[in-house]
Amino acid sequence: MPRKGSVPKRDVLPDPIHNSKLVTKLINKIMLDGKRGTAQRILYSAFDLVKERSGREAVEVFEEAIDNIMPVLEVKARRVGGSNYQVPVEVRPERRTTLGLRWLVNYSRLRGEKTMEERLANEILDAANNTGGAVKKREDTHKMAEANKAFAHYRW
């Protein structure tokens, strides 16, 4: 941590096509080795597939999917008297978004379809319908927090 106060948070520029900061953040999550153009091509192709398959605006479906993925609670390890407890804590809004995007991209990469565009599009559609790997991850995270509710008084 810096000694001289906090470091200002850099704001991302909204995406030029959809004018959405969330879309820019997703592009940054998809991007590997600094290849932004490739990441943008993947995302825009996936959005075309989403629009074609759902009949709705792709960004609307994407935002609905992210809302279904973002966790409200998570567990953090807390050491008390020689033993570690998994303590449920609320997730900050910024971290909720980050986790949602990370899980969406990671579970897209694990899917079986041939191209990344298809994988991402199908994961977005699944998440919008409350199914798919990313939503399951959120459910598992919430279950873990619920199971460890007894340790909630160890919060800090």
Swiss-Prot record:
KW Ribonucleoprotein (keyword) present: yes
A cellular-component GO term for this protein: small ribosomal subunit
Keywords assigned by UniProt, alphabetized: Ribonucleoprotein, Ribosomal protein, RNA-binding, rRNA-binding, tRNA-binding
UniProt superkingdom: Bacteria
Name the record gives this protein: Small ribosomal subunit protein uS7
A Gene Ontology biological process term: translation
PANTHER family per UniProt: RIBOSOMAL PROTEIN S7
Record-stated family: Belongs to the universal ribosomal protein uS7 family.
Organism lineage: Bacteria, Bacillati, Bacillota, Bacilli, Bacillales
Cross-referenced Pfam families: Ribosomal_S7
Gene Ontology MF terms in the entry: rRNA binding; structural constituent of ribosome; tRNA binding
Subunit structure: Part of the 30S ribosomal subunit. Contacts proteins S9 and S11.
Record-linked PROSITE patterns: RIBOSOMAL_S7
Role description: One of the primary rRNA binding proteins, it binds directly to 16S rRNA where it nucleates assembly of the head domain of the 30S subunit. Is located at the subunit interface close to the decoding center, probably blocks exit of the E-site tRNA.
